[in-house]
Amino acid sequence: MDTDLYDEFGNYIGPELDSDDEDDELGRESKELDELEDDDDDDDMGDHDEDHPGMEVVLHEDKKYYPTAEEVYGPEVETIVQEEDTQPLTEPIIKPVKTKKFSLMEQTLPVTVYEMDFLADLMDNSELIRNVTLCGHLHHGKTCFVDCLIEQTHPEIRKRYDQDLCYTDILFTEQERGVGIKSTPVTIVLPDTKGKSFLFNIIDTPGHVNFSDEVTAGLRISDGVVLFIDAAEGVMLNTERLIKHAVQERLAVTVCINKIDRLILELKLPPTDAYYKLRHIVDEVNGLISMYSTDENLVLSPLLGNVCFSSSQYSICFTLGSFAKIYADTYGDINYQEFAKRLWGDIYFNPKTRKFTKKAPTSSSQRSFVEFILEPLYKILAQVVGDVDTTLPRTLDELGIHLTKEELKLNIRPLLRLVCKKFFGEFTGFVDMCVQHIPSPKVGAKTKIEHTYTGGVDSDLGEAMSECDPDGPLMCHTTKMYSTDDGVQFHAFGRVLSGTIHAGQPVKVLGENYTLEDEEDSQICTVGRLWISVARYHIEVNRVPAGNWVLIEGVDQPIVKTATVTEPRGNEEAQIFRPLKFNTTSVIKIAVEPVNPSELPKMLDGLRKVNKSYPSLTTKVEESGEHVILGTGELYLDCVMHDLRKMYSEIDIKVADPVVTFCETVVETSSLKCFAETPNKKNKITMIAEPLEKGLAEDIENEVVQITWNRKKLGEFFQTKYDWDLLAARSIWAFGPDATGPNILVDDTLPSEVDKALLGSVKDSIVQGFQWGTREGPLCDELIRNVKFKILDAVIAQEPLHRGGGQIIPTARRVVYSAFLMATPRLMEPYYFVEVQAPADCVSAVYTVLARRRGHVTQDAPIPGSPLYTIKAFIPAIDSFGFETDLRTHTQGQAFSLSVFHHWQIVPGDPLDKSIVIRPLEPQPAPHLAREFMIKTRRRKGLSEDVSISKFFDDPMLLELAKQDVVLNYPM
């Protein structure tokens, strides 16, 4: 072999071979193959020749030793090559069937003391129905009270002696946390003192102030409230807020003073002091009602029957009437109704004359309430707690209570509960109170419709709803969305106000943005199944008539928060029910994103679901692309994030540090008239901005004044209450950024200077620009608040073509911004009202913790008849994160606090002062805070660090500023 023709690796490097040499090689190869194969394989041989690699280099990985799977099995067979160990050991080869379950539900209908058919029959008689919301402060015994009603009507459901039943805490998270998160409806049949049965639709609501949106949803579909107050703690933060909310919703108010056993067993008050304590609570509630209500007849008193007393833990519940009936049943020949009228107030019983007097017969005489109610109650509790073995059996015999030997051997708490249950019997006093003082759906319908329906009450539809007509056109108002056990679907919960809803019926669902002019927010759906909800089980029904509550399947897809369900045809004039108006504001903000970016669609679906589940939750996307959740507090957002991660998206989600929403405002009048020209130079608008009068923004938000009023009524309000001149008061164009927004646009032009007809033709466009501007302020894209914008001059083009919305709207927005920036702009931050309960020796520690967080105490007073103090304070929401934990650490867990949004307050410092240097990782002094908040908010939103005036000031306006020698702190 000639070595010159090959390199050291054996590759051929010689001259190209001629065709004769190639033919010789092919000939040799064909002879060898002919010896091995039959003549029939000649064609295959040709293919082999073509595929032969020849002399080129073949990489190891390209060498083919075996035929491919496709060649072996054919092109029709799919083959998958699986590398070894790609599946982690933590993941099973065959995954088990995954069942999600987040709530505790009964598998079958439990036994009740009434037939289900009887319950269904009562639904047809609206006069025998009561729709009631149970509300009250945190841990004042609402859920425990419902447990007593459930035990009374469900003989097989009994709570264990060592723990509460909590039948309406159906979510596992509620039971783990020991606090109600969702409002839970319960429909049961209860008898009154005379044995007459009524259908009670009760909704048990959370007591924590963070979840007051759940209470709002319950109040909307109720005709009255039962306000629960702890006898030992008295009126607390949320009690006062709920009284105000119920009065605003125009609902009947009754009170249940719960946990009266605490006065006896815990505080150990003498009977007379216990009476003073109870009377103080009633007086305090009446004082609050008179403060918020204009109805002078709305007075609470045990004598009127709208106050009852209870101890849910020991199955005690009575009104003066029901306690008097116990005496009547025991001694006979007593008119218990007349007797009940003498059991409250400064009334004494004279045993010699056997008469009641207003003057004490002797110095040692007790008031009738103490003598006939509290002293017997004290004796029963004292006998059970103190003398179980000696005198208790004899005492029980005198009361007609018979216990077995096994029952007498019970521990003190269960024994006391059993004795009280046998003595007081069923909760008929509570039923009497609700029946007498809370209107039936038929009686309360007119008030409910006037308050909640946006359409006319005088229309045929309005009249049908006012009469609660089951044969009228269908109108159903849904206020809550409840997810299924597995968190996949939602059922809409609401109240039928007119007509009858049937399973399988086609309906039209009207959303919150639906109007007769814009019907986009509506959808035709088919009702699935219908249920009556009883906390842990649902009773399926075929139809639900007017006046009842209903859980609806199949209509959840178009509903976001609340909705109006009506008939698809023949109800064209139907309008929506007013969206819920919450008594708190969502000011805490967190940004979320999935750990794995590819799971973003799952997170978005989860966000849509939590938005449905929580009434006041708001979700939005910032311009920077981050997804933001707004809630009322830390606990609220913690529950939202649990549901988002575990129930609805099942993915890992990253959460940013919590921040708060800000507002933008002004503290002076604009330093000069600000104007802006439209892009076509044919129109020019001039405005100034100035602060609103104190209290006016709150009046607008609380709908004390409404933009829908006629000009005369509107003018009178502003003239009398805020000293506006009549011309300005009657020239109000709009509130912004919506009908209840805390900003005002006023037309302050004169007919002699401005063509009012032309100005009127572009009014809608200017209002739209004003509302757009106030929705996103120039400082950091936050809401503008407390600002009055005055239109001083307007040059409007004659031709309609030159004054279209595309020209006017952005110009109006720009002039709003420029007028705002010329009026000494400031940032506003939300402030929380904090109520702390602590022993006297911990009060100083509370002051210390608050002072470190820019907080200040407004009131510090002892709770009457209790060893605790109540400290009331204000704290900036941005400094409130971790406050509760900090407080408990400093007081060894003895202090308990609740906080709720109260007001907006100006942040100290000028946000536009460029001389301030923000040092990273250092707390800023007070005058630097506004600047720090603005810069960090703008960074987070993806905006430039400083406000650029070139966006908001036209060239002619900048020239005018230069002439006026106005120094601006803004970059060009």
UniProtKB/Swiss-Prot annotation:
Keywords: GTP-binding, mRNA processing, mRNA splicing, Nucleotide-binding, Nucleus, Spliceosome. GO terms for cellular component: cytosol; nucleus; U2-type catalytic step 2 spliceosome; U2-type precatalytic spliceosome; U4/U6 x U5 tri-snRNP complex. One of its GO terms (biological process) is mRNA splicing, via spliceosome. Residues 17-26, 34-48 have a biased composition (Acidic residues). One of its GO terms (molecular function) is GTPase activity. SUPFAM superfamilies: EF-G C-terminal domain-like, P-loop containing nucleoside triphosphate hydrolases, Ribosomal protein S5 domain 2-like, Translation proteins. The keyword NAD does not apply. GTP binds at residues 136-143, 204-208, 258-261. Required for pre-mRNA splicing as component of the spliceosome, including pre-catalytic, catalytic and post-catalytic spliceosomal complexes. Component of the U5 snRNP and the U4/U6-U5 tri-snRNP complex, a building block of the spliceosome. As a component of the minor spliceosome, involved in the splicing of U12-type introns in pre-mRNAs. PANTHER family: 116 KDA U5 SMALL NUCLEAR RIBONUCLEOPROTEIN COMPONENT, TRANSLATION ELONGATION FACTOR-RELATED. Component of the U5 snRNP and the U4/U6-U5 tri-snRNP complex, a building block of the spliceosome. Component of the pre-catalytic, catalytic and post-catalytic spliceosome complexes. Component of the minor spliceosome, which splices U12-type introns. This is 116 kDa U5 small nuclear ribonucleoprotein component. It comes from Gallus gallus (Chicken).
